[in-house]
Amino acid sequence: MEAAQDSQPTPRWDFLTNHAHVLVCVARDPGIRLRDIAAAVGITERAAHRIVSELVDEGYVVRERQGRRNRYQVKTKLPLRHPLAEEREVGDLLEVLIA
C-alpha cells in the first residue's frame, strides 16, 4: 500500500513539447546518442531520430558526423517558432530550462 502512495502517476500532458525536450538534451550533451535522447524524453528511438532530423532540417541544430557518432550544435540565436514567442531566441528558452 505504501508503494502505491509514493509512486507518482505519469503526467498526461506537459508544458513543453518533445521537440523542446530533445533540444534540451542536445544542448546539455552535444555528443548524446539517439537512444539516450529517447530514454530521457520518454519516446521511441525512431521518434527521437525524427525530431532531431526535423530540428536539423529547420536549421535549429547542426549535426556533424565524428567517426561513428554524431555531434550536435544548437543554433541559439534563431527565433522561437510560435507567434507568441517569436521575439525570443532559442538560447533564451535553453537558458531558462538548463539553468
What feature does the model see in each segment?
Residues 1-7, 79-99:
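Amphipathic alpha-helical dimerization/coiled-coil segments
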Residues 2-21:
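Short alpha-helical segments that sit at the start of domains
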Residues 24-28:
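Short, locally clustered residues in the helix-turn-helix/winged-helix DNA-binding domain
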Residues 29-33:
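Short capping segments at the starts of secondary-structure elements
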Residues 39, 56-57:
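Alpha-helical residues within the helix-turn-helix
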Residues 46:
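Key DNA-contact positions within bacterial/archaeal DNA-binding proteins
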Residues 65-71:
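Short, Lys/Arg-rich nucleic-acid/phosphate-binding segment
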